Amino acid sequence: MSTTTLTRREQRAKAQHFIDTLEGTAFPNSKRIYVTGSQHDIRVPMREIQLSPTLIGGSKDNPQFEENEAVPVYDTSGPYGDPEVAINVQQGLAKLRQPWIDARNDSEELDDRSSAYTRERLADDGLDDLRFTGLLTPKRAKAGKRVTQLHYARKGIVTPEMEFIAIRENMGRERIRSEVLRHQHPGMSFGARLPENITPEFVRDEVAAGRAIIPANINHPESEPMIIGRNFLVKVNANIGNSAVTSSIEEEVEKLVWSTRWGADTVMDLSTGRYIHETREWILRNSPVPIGTVPIYQALEKVNGIAEDLTWEAFRDTLLEQAEQGVDYFTIHAGVLLRYVPMTAKRLTGIVSRGGSIMAKWCLSHHKENFLFEHFREICEICAAYDVSLSLGDGLRPGSIQDANDEAQFSELHTLGELTKIAWEYDVQVMIEGPGHVPMHMIQRNMTEELESCHEAPFYTLGPLTTDIAPGYDHFTSGIGAAMIGWFGCAMLCYVTPKEHLGLPNKEDVKQGLITYKIAAHAADLAKGHPGAQIRDNAMSKARFEFRWEDQFNLALDPFTARAYHDETLPQESGKVAHFCSMCGPKFCSMKISQEVRDYAAAQTIEVGMADMSENFRAKGGEIYLKREEA
């Protein structure tokens, strides 16, 4: 762990340099490929890992090799993963989805911003130096129209976004011919429906049923379509955002790009400090993945941090502000009801959700019902006009394993199920947020309760952390729970970094959290039996057995760390072709010995076979030519 501490000025300067010098970059021995669709000019980006050939025989002077197929993998890095694309953070990313949105002809550009706060910020000349220069003119659904992917799915329409997703979810596995790589153990899916091939129609059907969501605000055309649902690959979210204590716009944009490089399927901007509006604009215009927020955080800033002073009007203005910037999903704590708050009184750790505690304080101070619950239909109307998905927040999630699975937690969950049905009346897409801190033996009940209470809407959980004794290592404690609940059916896992409970994560913390959660998500996909999930594992195992060190590094989730660990003890180039590593050395490597046993067994088989043929030859009289027997 690095002990170097940078000053705030140095941190900002470093982030600014990262942004100024940013260019599309591929992982080692990987290249960007695009898989085309049947319509809509769809080009789905993937990363293809090139592999070296296997030595199968021959001599030192004339070796014989067998080619190994390149392995395609899911890629969240967007244009940042393509060396052929010119990157300019000042201009933002290309608007991939704009032609699809325009072709539907059900939205229109606004003459002015709907949010009073946005109009106020735009009129402030003092913010010019902070403002993103290429502001979009926001769109909204035409009168009487709904522009959500759920609306289209229910109408039987397969959108370009759905076809894009179908290609992406198949991960290019149709390109793989090797039976060794295609081999896969049957999974245990706990009722998940996993087709051998994901089609656009299957995507449409899952969205129409509410079992999956496509977070895709019409004002975020830069995003590459992705899907969150139990019957698809398990996804991972990364949290970024400034606070009143630390971080800047430059650092948050850097963390966004860094997150997509290391596999974040979505990113939540949880900023609570200065310039929230301006920071979010920079993030959205440069994000190839969906962006989520917790609007109550910014609404609280607008009333100077005093929860009691929150109003529906201030919150509504915040929803409009963020929807017209392009936020793809809102976390809304509408299930924290007044009558549930006393249920938390006997908890060891009370209410640990920021949003949940804000709304609980408001309810108690006014002795009124949660205004998010009271105005939920109006929230849905706003979301339907921009296609903002709802992530129904678990404001009463347990903050310690002692409080897991209690009355408050499940009471709120049941209310979230009721709100889900209301949102669906407006064709608004919904996912459900979950805990939290839950010991391993109590995790599965959370998934079962969510499926039953929330009508199979996608589940999105923070971990859960399986023990409370490891500050500094909570990416491990939560990664265990994340892998388990992903296997049981959770659709998206919110990462936890090593800084959880300790401080705001930096760039390296973001990477550590994401790698941990990509492992958890992939382990869950393997356990569920997601088609094609084992291809990369098989390729890695084959490379490992054949001592193809470069391929092992390049197939890893983190090639740089894998290479660095190997080179700590065997830095020479000869170490990259050696048939051993520093753990066992040349005489005790199990795989080298296994290869020798295999070669010996093959030789013995040949020798025994020759002996059998010799005996057969003698038994028939030792004649070179035998007479053909008469029929």
Curated annotation (Swiss-Prot):
GO terms for biological process: thiamine biosynthetic process; thiamine diphosphate biosynthetic process. Its cofactor is [4Fe-4S] cluster. InterPro entries: ThiC, ThiC-associated_dom, ThiC/Bza_core_dom, ThiC/BzaA/B. It catalyses: 5-amino-1-(5-phospho-beta-D-ribosyl)imidazole + S-adenosyl-L-methionine = 4-amino-2-methyl-5-(phosphooxymethyl)pyrimidine + CO + 5'-deoxyadenosine + formate + L-methionine + 3 H(+). It holds the Pfam family ThiC_Rad_SAM. It comes from the Bacteria. Gene3D superfamilies: 6.10.250.620, Radical SAM ThiC family, central domain. GO terms for cellular component: cytosol. GO terms for molecular function: 4 iron, 4 sulfur cluster binding; carbon-carbon lyase activity; zinc ion binding. Belongs to the ThiC family. PANTHER family: PHOSPHOMETHYLPYRIMIDINE SYNTHASE, CHLOROPLASTIC, THIAMINE BIOSYNTHESIS PROTEIN THIC. Homodimer. This is Phosphomethylpyrimidine synthase.
